[in-house]
Curated annotation (Swiss-Prot):
Record topological domains on the Lumenal side: 1-40, 103-106, 157-169, 237-245, 297-317, 370-383, 438-440, 504-522, 684-693
Residue span(s) of domain DEP: 759-837
Region GPCR: start-end pairs: 382-719
Record protein name field: Lysosomal cholesterol signaling protein
Transmembrane segments: 41-61, 82-102, 107-127, 136-156, 170-190, 216-236, 246-266, 276-296, 318-338, 349-369, 384-404, 417-437, 441-461, 483-503, 523-543, 663-683, 694-714
Membrane topology per record: Multi-pass membrane protein
Cytoplasmic side: 62-81, 128-135, 191-215, 267-275, 339-348, 405-416, 462-482, 544-662, 715-872
GO cellular component: lysosomal membrane
Spans annotated as PIN-like transporter: 3-372
Described function: Cholesterol-binding protein that acts as a regulator of mTORC1 signaling pathway. Acts as a sensor of cholesterol to signal cholesterol sufficiency to mTORC1: in presence of cholesterol, binds cholesterol, leading to disruption of the interaction between the GATOR1 and KICSTOR complexes and promotion of mTORC1 signaling. Upon cholesterol starvation, GPR155/LYCHOS is unable to perturb the association between GATOR1 and KICSTOR, leading to mTORC1 signaling inhibition. Binds indole-3-acetic acid and may play a role in tryptophan metabolism.
Record-linked InterPro entries: DEP_dom, GPR155_DEP, Mem_transp_PIN-like, mTOR-Rac_regulators, WH-like_DNA-bd_sf, WH_DNA-bd_sf
């Protein structure tokens, strides 16, 4: 809804092509006056791509196990204890306090304190007594502490380096406000919660307050700010040359490494979210990204009494932009240290970072408008829509490739989600084409309008149709759902509406705005479509909520039907929640004779039989590996039951109901904004600046829905990241294919395999290997990849699931274990692997086993290893 046709009559002539007729003054900053622009908006988009591109690289490195969570801690320590303190120290030393606008700092402090205490009080009133104080301590910190240095500073530098370079120094002054004045209050609440949980009567009130203040003083950022201010006066704002080069070397490494580390910390944070967590996250993110920016801006407008009107306006805009910065990773560190509200805080950090990018982009565009002239506004919305459509289309292509390659599009509700993604893709393509259609090409405009608005109305309707299908899935389990009717409705009704609009509507010839191409009739049609979709989606989700027990939504990583962890979304966690092995793979076996695989065409094949759902014994059995070693060494995927069940597991996967519910909730928010825009235009003749902001939000939502879909469905590592990693390794190292492991392996892999065979292999076999049926009357000793990962962590051979996967992959490369069909590398999933027979040439090294680990083995032998959720 990019319409400004309701502005005063003298400004209604927007028929000209904005890209050709706008003057230069409008093109640069959209400033109709002769004043210079307050910020360099042309550098914003590249800065956002730079920052979030590095974050994405870090995420891919963590998801692909190039850097494990344990290894990432070293990078985090370097960033927080060396790079950032050096950067802070130098900038505090050279800071010119005479140029600081202290009223700006007071305004930010009041705004942050207001949000902090509002969130704190509401949490104390609403939260359950069991965890009231921990929530009241961490949630306000979440809502007020921004990622000032890693994400904020590069963006401020891009916007204000050429116009107001002194604004960069405010980052170093504003950041300690939260750390020194507000965070101690939150820490004290957390210490009170810890005291209540432990019932430690000896811990008095003074000690609790002291511990809270001590945590603040231990923060390197706070410590270095005080040291830097002291040396500011001692050195007279001049850093010695021999020290300056050293500080520059550390400080210059901060930005890239901090953003990369941020991506690493985002891996697997969205996990096992319950229904109640959705509400909490939405409220916290709203407080951080919407309430705080507005309060910061209003406080500066109210308290700043600067002489320059331009500087006053620019400061208030800067305050708003500062408030939009996402949550700092340090909040997640605080939650982990206290072991309180970790899931909500870490998940919120990821979501706020993801959501803040489009908000910062739109906010910066809005802040460049000194007047309400409709021409530059319409031009800006056209360009924002075009830019977002390009990136969104790429995200949608990625997400659709995930659904196609995983074959989830064949099952519900992913079949309907695929239609939604296709409609969103057509919307982006239509917007891109609309941008190039000439004003006088009426036929071209009509054709593109039909393409654009048929698909846009389809995205509106698919939100409601997807919600009602989720309700039917939840209500009727696997009962047949009228998929054909839903698909026909999702595409047919929008096409019918656009057809009626073409026949009955009157073309508004003086507008190039697609949202007002057919004037009032189009706005009414859009409003009715939005209202119906919101009504259907809202009723469906409420009914779905009533039919489900409180908190019974499955986690992001758990399947409702199989209780299997969904591939690609489990965190590197030290103590994951227990998940049972799929029922597909468990039962008793009446006969456990050696597999009677026969040799044919150079390959071993198990006898062809009808599929049997249950294949393994309920108790671990020590198989005769020398006897059936060749069993399933090259099982045919069309005849072996284990291979068939693997394929069924990989294809069926998870219905991902929680992800679809979250998708519907986020889309409903955008539908409400569009409906508000339509109603505002129909009933209000004086739109004002808030209406303009709403128009920008609607444009970003309509053509940026791909970001939401990508964030929810586009991050499957096994279909995109790992294949790319394997291909890159193949090209880099010129390796053989996975089936040919005859090439020499590295000495490190040899040593790992020899140590495992000599000290750990037999115990591992006794603990995790089970007899599983692979033929009519045959069985083989196999184990699941996730079971080996759990065992490696249990005995201390790996510190986390990421390192365990690397260890298992070394065993595969060294020929110690092998996938039953040799199709997959080692994965932390319910895929079947087997131990290969010991090679005579493999002599164990002379290494003394650790006594403590041997004692640990004795304990493990008397107890079965716990079942952990796989890291996939």
């Amino acid at each position: 809804m990019n319409s400004f046709s309701n502005l005063p009559a003298e400004n209604l002539t927007i028929a000209v092509n904005m890209t050709k007729t706008l003057p230069t003054a409008v093109m640069h900053g959209f400033n109709s006056t002769n004043d210079p622009p307050s910020m360099s908006i042309t550098r914003l988009f590249p800065a956002l791509l730079e920052c979030f591109g590095i974050v994405l690289c870090g995420y891919i490195a963590g998801r692909a196990n190039v850097i494990t969570s344990t290894q990432a801690k070293g990078l985090g320590n370097f960033v927080s204890r060396f790079a950032l303190p050096a950067l802070l120290f130098k900038n505090m030393v050279v800071l010119n306090f005479s140029n600081v606008d202290w009223s700006f700092l007071y305004s930010i402090l009041i705004a942050k304190a207001s949000v902090f205490f509002i969130v704190c009080v509401l949490t104390l009133l609403v939260a359950s007594p069991d965890s009231r104080f921990s929530k009241a301590g961490l949630f306000p910190i979440f809502a007020t502490q921004s990622n000032d240095f890693a994400l904020g500073y590069p963006i401020v530098e891009a916007l204000y380096q050429t116009t107001y370079p002194e604004y960069l120094q405010y980052i170093y002054l504003v950041a300690p406000i939260s750390l020194m004045m507000l965070n101690p209050i939150g820490f004290i609440f957390c210490e009170i919660q810890k005291w209540k949980d432990t019932q430690n009567a000896s811990q008095n009130k003074i000690k609790i307050v002291g511990l809270g203040l001590l945590r603040v003083l231990q923060n390197p950022i706070v410590f270095m700010v005080f040291i830097g201010i002291a040396f500011n006066f001692i050195l007279d704002r001049k850093v010695p040359v021999y020290v300056e080069n050293f500080l520059d070397g550390l400080g210059n490494s901060f930005s890239g490494s901090a953003l990369f580390y941020l991506g690493l910390t985002m891996v697997g944070k969205i996990k096992r979210l319950k229904k109640s967590a959705f509400v909490v996250l939405i409220l916290l993110i709203t407080a951080k990204l919407l309430v705080l920016p507005l309060l910061c801006r209003e406080m500066v407008e109210l308290l700043d009494k600067g002489d320059s009107v331009v500087n006053h306006t620019s400061l208030s805009n800067y305050a708003f932009l500062y408030g939009v910065f996402p949550v700092a990773p340090g909040v997640a560190i605080f939650a982990t240290q206290f072991n309180m509200e970790v899931e909500i805080i870490t998940s919120g950090m990821v979501i706020s970072t993801f959501v803040s990018a489009p908000i910062m982009y739109v906010s910066a565009w809005l802040l460049t408008f000194p007047t309400m002239d409709p021409k530059p506004l319409a031009y800006a919305i056209q360009n924002v829509s075009f830019d977002i459509s390009i990136v969104s289309l790429i995200s949608l292509i990625w997400s659709q490739a995930i659904l196609l390659l995983s074959k989830k599009y064949k099952q519900l509700p992913h079949m309907l989600t695929t239609n939604l993604l296709i409609a969103q893709s057509i919307v982006c393509a239509g917007m891109m084409i609309w941008n190039f259609v000439k004003e006088k090409n009426f036929v071209g405009q009509i054709l593109v309008f039909v393409l654009l608005y048929s698909s846009l109305y389809s995205t509106y309707l698919w939100t409601g149709l997807l919600a009602i299908s989720l309700f039917l899935l939840k209500k009727r389990e696997r009962v047949q759902i009228p998929v054909g009717i839903i698909i026909i409705s999702g595409w047919g009704i929008p096409a019918l509406l656009v057809g009626v609009l073409l026949i009955t509507g009157k073309h508004s010839g003086d507008s190039i705005d697609s949202a007002f191409f057919y004037g009032k009739e189009q706005m009414i049609t859009t409003a009715v479509t939005l209202f119906c979709s919101i009504l259907i989606a809202g009723i469906s989700l409420m009914c779905m909520n009533r039919t489900a027990q409180a908190g019974s939504y499955e986690g992001f990583d758990q399947s409702q039907s199989h209780k299997v962890v969904e591939p690609g979304n489990t965190a590197f966690e030290e103590g994951p929640a227990p998940v049972n092995e799929p029922e597909l793979f468990t039962s008793s076996i009446p006969e456990t004779s050696c597999c009677s695989c026969s040799m044919g065409n150079g390959e071993l094949h198990c006898p062809s039989i009808e599929p049997i759902a249950n294949t393994s014994t309920s108790e671990p059995v020590i198989p005769s590996f020398e006897k059936n070693n060749h069993c399933v060494s090259r099982c045919n995927s069309q005849s072996c039951i284990l291979a068939q069940e693997e394929e069924q597991y990989l294809q069926s996967g998870d219905q991902q109901l929680t992800r679809h519910v979250l998708l519907c909730l986020l889309l409903i928010i955008g539908l409400f904004a569009n409906l508000s825009s339509c109603l505002w235009w129909l009933f209000n003749q004086e739109p004002g600046r808030l209406y303009v902001e709403l128009q920008f939000f609607c444009a970003v939502f309509n053509f940026g829905q791909g970001f939401i879909s990508f964030g929810i469905f586009g991050l499957d590592k096994h279909l995109i990241i790992l294949p790319f990693k394997r291909r890159l390794e193949f090209l880099w190292n010129n390796k053989e294919t996975a089936e040919n492991r005859d090439s020499p392996v590295s000495e490190e892999i040899k040593m790992t395999c020899q140590q495992f065979i000599h000290y750990h292999r037999d115990l591992c076999i006794r603990n995790i290997v089970k007899e599983r049926r692979c033929g009519a009357k045959t069985s083989a000793g196999t184990f699941c990849g996730c079971d080996l990962v759990n065992w490696l962590i249990e005995v201390g051979l790996a510190s986390d699931r990421g390192e365990a996967v690397i260890y298992g992959d070394r065993l595969v490369q060294g020929g110690v274990i092998q996938h039953i069909t040799n199709e997959y590398e080692f994965r932390d999933e319910y895929l079947f692997y087997r131990f290969l027979q010991k090679s005579p040439e493999q002599s164990p090294p002379v290494i003394n086993a650790n006594t403590l680990q041997q004692e640990r083995y004795k304990e493990i032998e008397h107890s079965s290893p716990p079942s952990h959720s796989p890291k996939t």
